[in-house]
């Protein structure tokens, strides 16, 4: 006589999350083509990530905007279920507040579980912060679980990637193998988010998703022509 089926003896693989925290400058200076291009880039990235999610990995996306004040949009949410709305530009550039929120998300094990892969925090800004940000950045990159995160950054326009703006972005990515991405026109925002997308999707398919590919390696792997548009956008 055959024994009864015992479901408790069988387990189902649960996808391990790869957290992505987007720090997006929505200050007044981002109005016009810049905020329009940013909205499009984020939407395309989420669309691509939702197609790449699988039984063994998912992309856990959090979006923190800073313009007037800093706030976390509904999240963290996996890319498939993300309901991204339209970002609007206005106010100052309270980066310090945004960095604090990012730190809290990563340290909180209810939002970034211990079983998650190494998070990536992505900073996009077009200028110099208007609040006190130095101590919060030090805390993010030097202390706790957040210090182990990968970090990528893009400066939009010369105010962001020259002088004090450049110094801030360089400090943000210190300790990583990334370089500051310079966008001297709104269209290049798309290129940066393609790079971010390639980085996390490459990691999700690798033997060890905690290892971060270098920017140069991603450029070498980038498809061309129609294939590039089909794969990434």
Label every PLM stretch briefly.
Residues 1-21, 26-36, 107-108, 113-114:
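Acidic, polar low-complexity linker/tail segments
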Residues 8, 57-86, 161-174:
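Short beta-strand-loop
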Residues 18, 28-58:
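…and closely analogous acidic/polar surface helices at protein-protein or active-site interfaces
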Residues 30, 69-101, 128, 143-147:
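Short, charged loop segments at secondary-structure junctions
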Residues 89, 127-175:
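VWA/integrin I-like adhesion module and closely mimicked acidic/polar interface patches used
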Residues 96-149:
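Exposed acidic/Ser/Thr-rich ligand/metal-binding surfaces
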Residues 153, 158-213:
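Von Willebrand factor A/integrin I-like adhesion domains
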Residues 186, 207-233:
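Extended acidic, low-complexity intrinsically disordered regions
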């Amino acid at each position: 006589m055959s024994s009864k089926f015992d479901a408790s003896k069988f387990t189902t693989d649960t996808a391990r999350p790869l957290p992505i925290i987007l720090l997006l400058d929505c200050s007044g200076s981002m109005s016009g083509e810049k905020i329009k291009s940013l909205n499009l880039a984020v939407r395309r990235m989420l669309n691509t990530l939702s197609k790449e999610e699988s039984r063994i990995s998912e992309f856990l996306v959090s979006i923190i905007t800073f313009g007037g004040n800093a706030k976390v949009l509904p999240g963290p949410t996996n890319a498939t279920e993300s309901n991204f709305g339209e970002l609007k530009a206005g106010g100052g550039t309270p980066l310090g507040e945004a960095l604090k929120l990012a730190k809290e998300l990563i340290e909180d094990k209810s939002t970034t579980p211990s079983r998650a892969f190494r998070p990536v925090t992505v900073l996009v800004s077009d200028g110099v912060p208007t609040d006190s940000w130095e101590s919060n950045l030090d805390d993010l990159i030097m202390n706790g679980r957040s210090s182990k995160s990968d970090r990528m950054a893009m400066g939009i326009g010369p105010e962001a990637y020259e002088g004090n703006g450049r110094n801030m972005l360089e400090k943000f990515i210190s300790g990583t193998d990334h370089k500051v991405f310079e966008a001297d026109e709104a269209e290049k925002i798309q290129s940066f988010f393609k790079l971010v997308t390639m980085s996390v999707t490459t990691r999700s398919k690798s033997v060890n998703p905690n290892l971060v590919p270098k920017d140069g390696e991603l450029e070498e792997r980038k498809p061309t022509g129609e294939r590039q548009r089909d794969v990434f956008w």
